[in-house]
Amino acid sequence: MEFTPALQPARLIQRYKRFLADVVTPQGETLTLHCPNTGAMTGCATPGDTVWYSTSSVATRKYPHTWELTQTRDGALICVNTLRANTVVKEALQAQRLPALAGYESLKSEVKYGAERSRIDFMLQASDKVNCYIEVKSVTLSEQDSGYFPDAVTARGQKHLRELMSVVEQGDRAVLLFAVLHSAITQVAPARHIDERYAELLSEAQRKGVEVLAWKASLSASEITLTSPLPVRL
């Protein structure tokens, strides 16, 4: 996906109330950005880091600027806007750039499914294949070049794993796709030290036939694109 116009830089002062962040631009102007990330954002919101923000053309928005990327002091780029994960995955699926998920005829988004009343991020369909259900998770937590999910205990994420296991049991295909939105990450693992139950369910899901994939994005102030697969260590 392209950022049009390109993102603008600023220096982070603080993130607060989960949804807001104050920054100062290179010209010395203080702005309040909308923060589209309700997670812990560990390592992504250190005061003094460079942030990159977009600006909406909608004049009625109370906070027209949105925090998109963080550039850490060691140079790593991180996409903190969790909505971008589904956007870049959808583009990759439509362009048939993910070999394990290519060859389908149609792509649907936000399809209702499951006993726990979930919505799957994407469903792929083809006349000669079983339906393929894809749940996307954004990975931004990095520790020693490893990416971890989740960054906080997630009952919702646990529910999604149970639903994916049910998909396999009914004879369809289920995929958990980690979209890695941190330039320093070289492999992905469940954050057992944060949410042990999620890690246990993920291992169980893989044993029962849920496919677990990770793809890393190339990040810049002008574009985000999924470019390369990464190993997943369970």
From Swiss-Prot:
Highest taxon above the source species: Bacteria
Gene3D superfamilies (UniProt xref): 2.40.50.580, 3.40.1350.60
GO molecular function: DNA binding
InterPro entries from the UniProt entry: SfsA, SfsA_C, SfsA_N
PANTHER family: SUGAR FERMENTATION STIMULATION PROTEIN A (PTHR30545:SF2)
Family to which this protein belongs: Belongs to the SfsA family.
The name this protein goes by in its record: Sugar fermentation stimulation protein homolog
Gene designation: sfsA
